[in-house]
């Protein structure tokens, strides 16, 4: 399973839904890639 938008995540083990989402190192949640 992958993590949805604004879900808490770990930047060193990014499980956010690809390819749209990426784990923000600053905020520690899944954000849309710009």
From Swiss-Prot:
One Pfam family here: Toxin_12
Designated name of the protein: Beta-theraphotoxin-Ps1a
Distribution of this protein across tissues and organs: Expressed by the venom gland.
Localization per Swiss-Prot or TrEMBL: Secreted
Gene Ontology CC entries for this record: extracellular space
GO MF term list: sodium channel inhibitor activity; toxin activity
Keywords: Disulfide bond, Ion channel impairing toxin, Knottin, Neurotoxin, Secreted, Toxin, Voltage-gated sodium channel impairing toxin
One annotated GO biological process: envenomation resulting in negative regulation of voltage-gated sodium channel activity in another organism
Job of this protein: Potent inhibitor of Nav1.2/SCN2A voltage-gated sodium channels (IC(50)=0.6-0.7 nM). Also weakly inhibits Nav1.1/SCN1A, Nav1.4/SCN4A, Nav1.5/SCN5A, Nav1.7/SCN9A and Nav1.8/SCN10A (IC(50)=20-610 nM). It acts by shifting the voltage dependence of channel activation to more depolarized potentials and by blocking the inward component of the sodium current. It shows low affinity for lipid bilayers. In vivo, this toxin causes general ataxia, lack of response to stimuli, and semiparalysis. After a few minutes, the mice are unable to stand, and breathing is reduced in rhythm and intensity.
Similarity annotation: Belongs to the neurotoxin 10 (Hwtx-1) family. 08 (Gtx1-15) subfamily.
The keyword Disulfide bond is annotated on this UniProt entry: yes
InterPro entries according to UniProt: Huwentoxin-1, Huwentoxin_CS1
Keyword NADP: no
Disulphide-bridged cysteine pairs: 2-17, 9-23, 16-30
Organism: Paraphysa scrofa
Domain statement: The presence of a 'disulfide through disulfide knot' structurally defines this protein as a knottin.
């Amino acid at each position: 399973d992958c993590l949805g938008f604004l879900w808490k995540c770990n930047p060193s083990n990014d499980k956010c839904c690809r390819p749209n989402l990426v784990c923000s190192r600053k905020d520690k949640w899944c954000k849309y890639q710009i």
